[in-house]
């Protein structure tokens, strides 16, 4: 029985590396850089900066949410207190004032 040979693609060495002697456009002298793309790429720095910005935005959003909950809790507590006062007033008017009017 004839089998097809198993082949796999061999990655290109230039896909993830840069030449060791790399010349920047701003200077005429070649610089010796690392051949690893991760160390020479600004992409990693941009990703890290983007993650930092997103983390700061998330922290600011969380702080705003916590403050909103505090404000809403204060308003809810104030509303509950107002309801208790109103209920107490109605209870007083209903129980004491109505009983006094029947006795006289």
UniProtKB/Swiss-Prot annotation:
It is found in: Membrane. Its main location: membrane. Keywords: Membrane, Transmembrane, Transmembrane helix. It is a single-pass membrane protein. The keyword Transmembrane helix applies. The chain crosses the membrane at residues 77-98. GO terms for cellular component: endoplasmic reticulum membrane. Almost completely overlaps ATP1. This is Putative uncharacterized protein YBL100C. It comes from Saccharomyces cerevisiae (strain ATCC 204508 / S288c) (Baker's yeast).
């Amino acid at each position: 029985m004839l089998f097809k040979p198993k082949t796999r693609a061999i990655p290109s060495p230039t896909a993830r590396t840069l030449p060791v002697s790399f010349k920047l456009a701003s200077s005429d002298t070649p610089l010796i850089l690392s051949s690893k793309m991760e160390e020479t790429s600004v992409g990693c720095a941009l990703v890290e900066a983007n993650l930092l910005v997103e983390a700061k935005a998330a922290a600011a959003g969380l702080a705003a949410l916590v403050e909103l909950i505090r404000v809403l809790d204060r308003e809810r507590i104030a509303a509950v207190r107002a309801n208790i006062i109103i209920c107490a007033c109605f209870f007083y008017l209903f129980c004491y004032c109505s009983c006094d009017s029947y006795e006289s």
